[in-house]
Amino acid sequence: MRRPLAVVLGALLVPAALRAQGDTATFVLPNFHFADGESLAVLKLHSLTLGHPRRDASGHVANAVLILHGTGGTGRLFLNPLFTELYQPGEALDTTTHYIILPDDIGHGRSSKPSDGLRMKFPHYAYADLVTAEYRLVTEGLHVDHLLVVMGTSMGCMHSWMWAERYPDFMDGVVPLACLPTQIAGRNRMLRRMAMDAIRTDPAWQGGDYTSQPPGLRGAAEVLFFMTSAPRRLQRDFPTRDSADAEITRWMDHELATLDANDFLYQFDASRDYDPSRDLGRIKARVLAINSADDEVNPPSLDIMAQLFPKVPHGRYVLLPISDLTRGHGTHTVAAAWKQYFAPFVAGLEHSK
């Protein structure tokens, strides 16, 4: 999911050491076939990596961590200082001892996407295709044969559940941040549908063949703001009419400068095949699932985790109470809010190897 403006601005403040350490690469997959039968002659998958892989006595990679971004995001989101404290010496994902993989999914960032030129003729990918591409990037592009942890935020959170079920022996641990292990329905689906309809029903969209971004894109972005923002946090940070007006103006200006209507439609339509609820009992990896009480995308009042999480054989679920650290749905990128649970989880995985 796209980020609140405070998180977006923070992502621009990338520590120099990380900029110097990170390696970027584009992995090319020829003739990539999608689950619905469509194909793409050349699929480009971009990734950023931090640290270096380390192999154990058996020759398997032992320290790789795959971190998956949310809808509309990129791997560079995890260079945000709110998250990069995890990479510091002695921290849970210390980049001197871990190999961090930060991909851009299909349809996002520097990977192949509709706005590259195909527009609505781009294959209509779904989450299953994104996970397949992630796996091929890891195994064929980066030659990693095992992951210590698969973790992700929002859409990436959902992908982490899919990884746990599709590749149950490939990772030691899974950390889904800010999602539910069931199909997107109810208010969540309705808001997504409203956002997409704001574009599709705009005559200026022209079936995807627009020459400038259609005005309906603004309405779509406004729906996302309602969907992902945290009322308590916004009231605290913008307590006057003028400050609130200034913030929403800055946020909208940034969104409209970076969004593309066709990319947006593909990104939000891709969740149509997501529903890991039936196979939760088949997960072999240890799971640490984390949500926050002020997340309006996945509100705890739905009681979905209470119903489904007991099916996970080796799991722990943490619901973070509302605090000065939580930011609604965006809490997933605020490491300080949840690293007290994450750090011992990772340490436990490493000690059990």
Task: Please describe what each predicted stretch is.
Residues L48-D116:
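N-terminal cap/lid subdomain of alpha/beta-hydrolase-fold enzymes
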Residues I283, A289-N291:
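Short beta-strand/loop motif that positions the catalytic acidic residue
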Residues E91-G141, G186-N188, R192-G207, D324-T326:
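Cap/lid segment of the alpha/beta-hydrolase catalytic domain
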Residues F170-H254:
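Alpha/beta-hydrolase-fold enzymes
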Residues Q21-A64, G75-R76, H351-K353:
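Catalytic-loop region of hydrolases
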Residues H146-A185:
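Conserved hydrolase catalytic core segment
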Residues E296-D303:
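Conserved alpha/beta-hydrolase "acid-adjacent" motif
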Residues G315-K353:
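Catalytic active-site module of serine/aspartate enzymes centered on a nucleophile-bearing elbow/loop
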